[in-house]
Amino acid sequence: MRVENGIATLHGAPEISVLLRRSGRARRLSLRVSGLDGRVTLTMPQSLHLSTALEFLRERESWLRTAMTRLPAPCPVALGADILLRGEILRITEGCGARIHVQGSQLRVPPDPTGTRTALRVATYLKASARAALVPASEKYAAALGRPFSAITLRDTRSRWGSCTAQGRLMFSWRLIMAPPAVLQYVAAHEVAHLKYMDHSRTFWTCVAQLMPDYQTHRDWLSNNGAALHNYCFTSRPEADNG
């Protein structure tokens, strides 16, 4: 095992990098594998000696390797591959025009002789589609709540689907456009509700229910299926949109 710059590397096939994280709140050692990106984190109490944590990691290496094999394989975005858009599976195929568009059960993309631009083009298309859906959804719920927001930003976040700052700035993951439209609407309602309640109290959830009475169904969909949206692998990702 090699330890460098807060990363422990387990030798073998394949090598596994483990982020070593100290936490003042941790009372015991905890080894976790992210279902979103496969990242491995070993969390330890502040006062625990590093050698104890590394021994814990060695003892659980077999479990860790088994857990890694159970992670879903990434889905490269390329010609001939499938992708989700608004909850529907579309096949990425080559079109003859200069713009991406949906045609039946296909996502038609411009010709890409080198095979190097399709993923970025699709990601950019998804991001634009997400903005076109999230802006009016947020405006609708903000108007219903009587609380305006100051800006909307789209990012490719892995730890959360959206956020709301005290300054009224809303942030959303553009991958929400892959989910069914009602799921995207739920996240918009959720974040807009934070314009009034900056917590997850019972009052907050009552507010969400007022904006979207059947929100729980869509929240459950995201809990059960959201990780799959992160399996799609784009060779290049669009920059954050601060518009």
Give the residues covered by each predicted segment.
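Walker B catalytic acidic pair
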Residues: 191
